[in-house]
Amino acid sequence: MPKITFMGAGSTVFAKNVLGDCMMTPALEESRIALYDIDRNRLEESALMLEAINRNNGSKAVIEKYLGVSMRKEALRGADYVVNAIQVGGYDPCTITDFEIPKKYGLRQTIADTLGVGGVFRALRTIPVMLDFARDMEEVCPDAWLLNYTNPMAMLTGAMLTMSSIRTVGLCHSVQVCAPTLLNELCMGYDDRVQVKIAGINHQAWLLECTRDGEDLYPEIKRRAKLYNEGKLEIGTWEERRAMLSNGEPLPGQWEERMKEEYDLYRKTGRHGDMVRLELMLRFGYYITESSEHNAEYTPYFIKQRYPELIGRFNIPLDEYPRRCIRQIEEWESRREELTKNPMLTHERSREYASYIMEAMETGHPVKIGGNVLNKGLITNLPQRACVEVPCMADRNGIQPTVIGDLPEQCAALNRTNINVQLMTVEAARTRKREDIYRAVMLDPHTSAELSIDDIVSMCDEMIEAHRDWMPEYS
């Protein structure tokens, strides 16, 4: 049976989803699972949780723990699949730094993990560590597949695909939830009759086609989206709204609380949490996979010192990721006992791609995914060295991406503004030149629309110094 190594196993809830999925999959349930982390306590907590799930599933898997860099190569040795979920530098201090230093220069961010100065420095902290993984993998498991879940997805996956020989695919759940989110929030409902075509780049892939029983849904989507952004779409009672957004499935308490808060906000003010994406769709013609808080900082249109009223108009949550980190830490404290000390803990297979990919490669039964891969002629009006997100087929032969051809030109043009930053950041990680970091941040759409070149250079110098313990030297 296969060996699955999970890098960053201290990401306990995510490890439960991915590895719990594997243990619930007949083709993978007898796997040898290697948990690797540099944090002893989090590693132990994840192991306790997964061992309980395994016992309640008949103890079919073998679970092993590997702590610290000295054990990394052994964790990887003989692996068939490697799942990457690391965060270099963590929330405190690195995420805090990614927000606070730019804020001194008047540059505000929402998430800062994929693009912008925050995304660039997150990549520069992470790429050297992932290349260390790659060097170990080239020695002890050269034929393994690396399934990367860590952001910034395009930068990290692109670096692995161009700077190592390791077979890598980047995975992001925003593809799976794109059409259901859009149709349910517009009260159109989502079901298995809906067919979609999605392609572009990670967090900015485009819903190119959306049909139900062959009928193009876009005309009605755009009609309702305009009403929704004007606060005029009738969304029903709270009970009706909750059932629509959840597809009738039970929700964790904290999710339901946030949905209710957003429902009340819309009823009171006409504002909601997806206004940026719907505005971009109405302007560019197509809906984008990732959330509005992300896309607010991928473009130069919404977070602007000169137009502070846009923050309220489009309901943009500045500094959202630090708040989210604090909330997740608090929620983990409340769930710790439930997940690590519950002898009856079980798991139901989630929608995360990882176990479905492994199952397809083990059994030969193909599965369609949205994967991040190198653009080798797949999207013909995007750069060939870009990391693109396209439909892929997974089976015993690995990952076979789909050729899309040209995107609508306005969609490709917006993608290219993000790709410029991604490629320049990977180049900075390769050259270790400070000037290439400056160039990556200078090319960022949001940063360049707000700051002068001199301020960008000064900000980068401060960031480099603050992150010195997590980044290699730059000349």
Model-predicted regions and their roles:
Residues 92-162:
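Rossmann-fold NAD(P)-binding glycine/threonine-rich loop
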Residues 2-29:
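N-terminal Rossmann-like dinucleotide-binding module
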Residues 24-58:
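Glycine-rich phosphate-binding loop and adjoining beta1-alpha1-beta2 segment
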Residues 190-475:
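Long, compositionally biased stretches enriched for glycine and/or charged residues
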Residues 63-76:
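Short acidic low-complexity segments
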Residues 79:
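An anion/phosphate-binding loop that grips the pyrophosphate of nucleotide cofactors and donors
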Residues 133-221:
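Internal, well-ordered domain-core segments that constitute the primary functional module
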Residues 86-89:
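Conserved NAD(P)H cofactor-binding loop of Rossmann-fold oxidoreductase domains
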